[in-house]
Amino acid sequence: MRLLVCDTSDKNCSAGIFEDGKEICYELSFESKTHSETFMPLVHIVMAKAGVKHEDLDGYAVTVGPGSFTGIRIGVAAVKGMALAAGKKCIAVSSTEALARSCENATMTPKNETLIVPAIDARNNRVFAQAAEDDTLKALIPEDAYDADALTEKISKIPEVIYGKRRQILVVGSGATVMKKAFEKAGYGLNIYYAPGAAIMPKGVAAAAFAGKELIDARDLKASYCAVSQAERLKKNG
């Protein structure tokens, strides 16, 4: 199966072509321009590099959130439009799962001994995050929007952490700095590593997409925000 994989859910954006889980090519954008300016040019570049047209694809995979509300809207709308025009199906990928899969093999301990916490900065001491086993990516704390202090407490109470089965915690993504402050304030004495520079990579989106995710009709592709946007909160509050 050949997929165009895409991410616009955080500060950077990316696109890539993968076939049966193997990378053909990909492009990343770290520019200060908005995703509305950079995303579709990236798609055109990777399609040209791979020598494929939309009719040559079997589908599209895109991160649907949580993350940047504006970025998610851009990515989901663009992928939905491409898929509808080409008559192809889509795969919805969790942003935090894609982030975790982008950081596979980054742990200091052997597989099955680390708790990985992909965290995306949601501002105001909040993160979009989950906590999962590094080997199976089974979520021990589900993906949601969390207050950083509350999340650190939840993590400290996970039985696998308490009893040492997961003897290292790896916090990755733009929310790692927020989580570091929260853990340091709490003083739990846990063995924690932080990778604030870690980002969602096309290989992470592809790994999630090829991990048995369902192909859905493009019309059913929806964003997963996990929170109400600031604009919507202000509107609601008058």
Predicted regions: what they are:
Residues Y193-G238:
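Acyltransferase
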Residues E37, P41-A48, A98-R101, D149-E153, ...:
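Short, contiguous clusters of charged residues that form electrostatic/catalytic patches at enzyme active sites
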Residues V46-A50, A85, C103, M201-E214:
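Stable alpha-helical structural segments in soluble proteins, enriched in small hydrophobic residues
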Residues K22, E31-T34, K89-A199, Y225, ...:
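Surface "functional belts" at beta-alpha junctions
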Residues M1-V64:
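N-terminal beta-alpha supersecondary unit
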Residues A61-C90, S95:
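DPxDG-like acidic metal-binding loop motif
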